[in-house]
């Protein structure tokens, strides 16, 4: 079967991401009267007046204004970079998440599927910087649960992980952070392990 004709028959998977969420990339405070949270909307839409929840602080505030560039708008949607001003002070910094009904969770440990790309093997007990969304924190690989045969999908017992191998690993973080399953929220469901010495 030709590739083009096959692609024409493929059933496109429905987008399963829920609610609104925006990882905060930067806090903008040009003067004492304005404090805006900048980032890209990863899912959903936000409108002036909406009630948002801040994570991990779990505070609630209403949207006072939304800026796209230097233009104030009443609504912004997925994919747009925005500055959001809230109607009261909240405990938010880079790496925090603004959300409405997203169902994202706070946790200090996850089980993640890892594709290992380093020449040196991965072993239990290795420390990393872990980047999820706009947040980067210290983390630890506490256990390699099993590796996955890329040809058969078979799960195999594993104690180390070599370059280009895939495994399920348990990770612990230095603090509770906002995460979710990749199928539910892509940005909050993917992570990068960064070597604390080489930054690679």
Cite the ranges covered by each PLM segment:
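C-terminal effector/interaction modules appended to NTPase cores
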Residues: 32-200
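Canonical P-loop GTPase G-domain recognition
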Residues: 1-19, 23-28
């Amino acid at each position: 079967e030709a590739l083009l004709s096959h692609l024409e028959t493929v059933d496109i998977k429905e987008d399963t991401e829920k609610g609104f969420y925006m990882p905060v990339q930067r806090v903008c405070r040009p003067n004492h009267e304005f404090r805006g949270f900048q980032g890209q909307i990863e899912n959903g839409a936000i409108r002036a007046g909406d009630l948002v929840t801040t994570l991990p602080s779990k505070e609630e505030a209403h949207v006072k204004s939304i800026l796209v560039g230097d233009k104030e708008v009443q609504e912004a949607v997925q994919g747009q970079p925005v500055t959001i001003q809230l109607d009261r002070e909240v405990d938010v910094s880079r790496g925090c998440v603004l959300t409405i009904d997203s169902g994202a969770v706070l946790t200090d440990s996850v089980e993640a599927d890892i594709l290992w790309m380093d020449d040196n093997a991965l072993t239990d007990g290795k420390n990393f910087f872990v980047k999820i969304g706009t947040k980067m924190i210290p983390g630890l690989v506490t256990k390699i649960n099993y590796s996955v045969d890329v040809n058969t999908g078979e799960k195999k017992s594993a104690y180390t992980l070599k370059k280009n191998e895939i495994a399920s690993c348990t990770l612990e973080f230095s603090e509770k952070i906002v995460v979710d399953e990749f199928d539910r929220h892509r940005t909050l469901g993917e992570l990068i392990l960064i070597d604390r010495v080489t930054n690679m």
